[in-house]
A protein has these predicted regions:
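Intrinsically disordered, low-structural-confidence terminal and linker regions
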Residues: 1-69
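Extended, domain-scale alpha-helical bundle/helix-rich regions
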Residues: 76, 80-265
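Short, glycine/small-residue-enriched coil/turn segments at secondary-structure junctions
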Residues: 237-251, 300-323, 335, 352-357
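Short helix/loop capping segments that flank catalytic or ligand/cofactor-binding pockets
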Residues: 255-258, 263-265, 306-308, 318-319, ...
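Cytosolic, membrane-proximal regulatory domains of ion/volume homeostasis and mechanosensation machinery
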Residues: 264-294, 319-360
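Cleft-lining beta-strand/loop regions that shape enzyme active-site pockets
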Residues: 297
Length: 360
């Protein structure tokens, strides 16, 4: 009997536990999310370590800034002590407060994303921090906290510290063939299945540049594996001589196509209309795109993760604008002014339009 597809597994999840997760970055069954978080909490508890220097800096910022101290405490207080927000029958929250949050971050900073043979999905993949913050993100104080410029400067440092670990040889331990390794029977099968997109039946090593005879298939780190190269002949460019054809920049799934885009719009409201001025950071170039079409896609967790130019041409300007990391729109949380919503369990999906701006 063959391994079930991701969609078949999702279809078998009871409705009350099912969450739509674009790109499979978080499991479709919220029970898997809770189980994973329980494991991280237990691991961090049984093997406590001194806080990473960047987290000591974060703790100092929280405790020496009255505004941030108020918001971080309030966002945990605002999580309802009822299902599905609590994990146990007496209403205890899984992540209790900001010291507990930092303790879990501390564990994450020295661990790479593991493969999961869970029946309902592939585990947390690249969003374990999002999983830890899932509930506080959707509270009114969480909304303010994750928009705060000082908080986001600190979160950037935290994520960069994790990035350094993921680029180190120590992170390659998850590239084994055991049940938590990405080259386990199910892991390598699902990676190849995704890359074959239902049209071919190539093996992983036939699709991607690697050496199966070497340890970890020759990949030196988690980052080396995650940004693996594909064999050129497996992804020919569509109509390279025809300028009317725009290729996908990466192996992404369509999220939204919007036409007749306004120069500026209320991107934070339900429906998440695109706002060119804010998307392009006030750059005068926005004027060229008013009334045009925006195509937004979502990259799958299992897909090929290198980017290619969607059109031919010459890059004349490029820049990076710092923004927010875990901000989600209020209409998807208990902060919804209408009072009709609980905290969104799939914020990384429902906030996709909103996060095209997030550069405050």
């Amino acid at each position: 009997m063959g391994r079930k597809s991701h969609q078949e597994n999702v279809d078998n999840v009871p409705h009350e536990h099912r969450v739509h997760r674009a790109g499979s970055w978080l499991p479709a069954d919220h029970r898997v999310h809770k189980s994973w978080l329980e494991k991280i909490i237990e691991n961090a508890k049984v093997d406590p370590k001194d806080l990473h220097p960047v987290l000591k800096e974060f703790k100092k910022l929280i405790e020496e800034n009255t505004r941030i101290y108020m918001l971080v405490n309030a966002m945990f207080d605002e999580i309802p002590t009822k299902k599905p927000y609590n994990q146990d029958p007496v209403g205890h929250k899984q992540v209790r407060d900001y010291p507990h949050m930092l303790e879990l971050f501390n564990y994450i900073l020295t661990h790479a994303p593991e493969w999961s043979d869970s029946e309902y999905g592939i585990g947390m993949v690249g969003t374990p921090v999002n999983a830890i913050l899932d509930w506080p993100m959707g509270t009114p104080s969480g909304f303010a906290f994750f928009l705060d410029p000082d908080v986001n400067k600190m979160l950037k440092k935290v994520l960069n510290a994790w990035g350094e670990y993921l680029a180190s040889p120590e992170s390659a331990y998850v590239l084994g063939t055991d049940s938590y390794g990405w080259f386990s029977e199910h892991g390598v099968h699902d990676l190849a299945l995704t890359a074959n997109v239902g049209q071919t039946s190539h093996k992983f090593e036939e699709l991607f540049k690697c050496d199966p005879s070497k340890k970890h298939y020759g990949y030196q780190s988690w980052d080396d594996f995650f940004t693996r190269h594909i064999h050129d002949d497996k992804r020919p460019v569509a109509s390279p001589e025809d300028d009317n054809v725009i290729a996908n920049a990466c192996e992404s799934k369509s999220f939204k196509v919007a036409r007749n885009i306004s120069a500026r719009d209320r991107f934070w409201i339900k429906g998440q209309p695109y706002s060119l001025i804010d998307m392009l950071n006030m750059d005068p170039l926005y004027e060229q795109f008013v009334g045009g079409t925006i195509y937004q896609a979502f990259l799958s967790a299992l897909s090929y993760h290198r980017w290619h130019a969607p059109v031919s041409g010459k890059v004349v300007k490029a820049y990076v604008k710092d923004g927010t990391y875990f901000s989600e729109p209020l209409f998807e949380g208990v902060g919804d002014p209408s009072g009709k919503h609980g905290i969104d369990e799939g914020g990384e999906k429902t906030g996709q339009g909103y996060l095209t701006v997030r550069n405050y």
